[in-house]
From Swiss-Prot:
It is an enzyme of class 2 (transferase). CDD domains: AdoMet_MTases (cd02440). This is 23S rRNA (uracil(1939)-C(5))-methyltransferase RlmD. GO terms for biological process: rRNA base methylation. Belongs to the class I-like SAM-binding methyltransferase superfamily. RNA M5U methyltransferase family. RlmD subfamily. It catalyses: uridine(1939) in 23S rRNA + S-adenosyl-L-methionine = 5-methyluridine(1939) in 23S rRNA + S-adenosyl-L-homocysteine + H(+). Catalyzes the formation of 5-methyl-uridine at position 1939 (m5U1939) in 23S rRNA. S-adenosyl-L-methionine binds at residues 264, 293, 298, 314, 341, 362. The gene is rlmD. Gene3D superfamilies: 2.40.50.1070, Nucleic acid-binding proteins, Vaccinia Virus protein VP39. It holds the Pfam family tRNA_U5-meth_tr.
């Protein structure tokens, strides 16, 4: 009878070695050298020495954990959050913000083989205008409300979260008390909080119908806190209990959105990012501009305030409809939105028949492989690529460089301080 064994990590004997860290990777791990290869050590900073235990040993690199830190870097910070190290939300609160930004910029520069010209950043605390907190109410135990543990599905009960917008953080204990008082706590899935330009939103996901008494209690809570409340009994259904359609500002334009629509988490960085895209593209009154993966028009509509015409292409129908509504609401009549799958053959899609002078694209983590060939065929003068995944950015950039484009500006977007997320934007110009 055949037997199957799960692959095991190659681990050395648990000997303690002393190392000195000389670098920090973009995820906030200290990097040392041992036996001629990189040794990654969470929790250590450059110029710190420590006794460590190797936990994983591979051909190209190894990992270790700290047994005893021997000195502290001047760039080490005391984490503000009492849940840091347990909650999986933040990985770098022990790292000074300047070092965080330098390490992310260095990683981006290495990957793109180009210096980082700009760091676009806002406040490093209180920046998150959106959060999703998991809910669980085990039998005979208090309601759990918080974020997932690092590497686990367990919930960390959070009483505070200093990266949340102050208005949202202040609500946490009162929301917990309200939800814990409901009769249907065992049917609660998660709660989403959004700080929109129009005020605070609360979206409550529940897996079974709420009683009339529970709904009434939630509505009273929403009125007393001055927030808009939405119930989500199923993934595709949203019931408005109180409040109106929310909106946020993008480069002076008011964009309404559905409470579940994607909006950038960091408002300050989003505003700077949109302004920088307009600057880099050097949009002029005669320009025809293409915005791919456009969402509800975060870039599209500001572009339309300057260009002769703008075309936005997006794969989610609801976002396309919202983009059209927002164009009308803002009096922009030179915008056309298309609902198309940009992972398919785009050459037969109606928007692809047009010519464009300049292109902006803001794809998801998978990147934009499906449209790169067509972008090159369009021969735009300038291309701005906004990325949430440096690996796919580097891959797609290679296609543009091979087609005669040159990277002329590279910016690191510090969209998520104290985390390992690395976002960026690049300007390509046709040579």
């Amino acid at each position: 009878m055949a037997q199957f064994y799960s692959a095991k990590r190659r681990v050395t004997t648990r000997q303690i070695i002393t190392v000195k860290v000389n670098d920090l990777d973009s995820f906030g791990q200290g990097v040392a050298r041992h036996n001629g290869k990189a040794l990654f050590i969470p929790g250590l900073l450059p110029e710190e020495s420590a006794e460590v235990i190797i936990t994983e040993d591979k051909k190209q690199f190894a990992r270790a954990r700290v047994s005893r830190r021997l000195n502290d870097s001047p760039e080490r910070e005391t984490p503000r959050c009492p849940h840091f190290g347990v909650c999986g939300g933040c990985q770098q609160q022990h790292v000074g913000i300047d070092l965080q930004q330098r390490s992310k910029s260095a990683a981006l520069a290495r990957l793109m083989k180009h210096e980082v010209n700009d760091i676009i950043a806002g406040a490093s605390w209180g920046y998150r205008r959106r959060a999703r907190l998991s809910l669980n109410c085990p039998p005979d135990k208090p309601l759990q409300m918080g974020f997932r543990k690092a590497g686990s599905s367990d919930i960390v009960n959070v009483e505070q979260c200093p990266v949340l917008a102050p208005q949202l953080e202040a609500l946490l204990p009162r929301i917990r008390a309200c939800l814990a008082s409901l009769h249907g706590t065992r049917h609660l899935g998660h709660v989403e909080l959004v700080q929109a330009g129009s005020g605070t939103l609360m979206i409550l996901r529940h897996t079974a119908p709420l009683s009339a008494a529970d709904k009434e209690k939630l509505e009273r809570f929403s009125h007393s806190e001055g927030l808009s409340l939405f119930l989500a009994p199923f993934s595709e259904i949203l019931e408005t209990v109180s409040g109106e359609a929310p909106w946020y500002d993008s480069h002076g334009l008011r964009l309404t959105f559905s409470p579940r629509d994607f909006i950038q988490v960091n408002e300050a960085v989003n505003q700077q990012m949109v302004a920088r895209a307009l600057e880099w593209l050097d949009v002029r009154a005669e320009d025809r501009v293409l915005d791919l993966f456009c969402g509800m028009g975060n870039f599209t509509l500001p572009l339309a305030t300057r260009a002769a015409s703008v075309v936005g292409v997006e794969g989610v129908q609801a976002l396309v409809e919202k983009g059209r509504e927002n164009a009308i609401r803002n009096g922009l009549h030179n915008v056309t939105f298309f609902h198309e799958n940009l992972e398919e053959d785009v050459t037969k899609q109606p928007w692809a028949k047009n010519g464009f002078d300049k292109v902006l694209l803001d794809p998801a983590r998978a990147g934009a492989t499906g449209v790169m060939r067509h972008i090159i065929k369009l021969k735009p003068i300038r291309i701005v690529y906004v990325s949430c995944n440096p690996a796919t950015l580097a891959r797609d950039s290679e296609a543009l460089v091979n087609a005669g484009y040159e990277v002329t500006r590279l910016a690191m977007l510090d969209m998520f301080p104290h985390t390992g997320h690395l976002e960026s934007m690049v300007l390509f110009e046709r040579m």
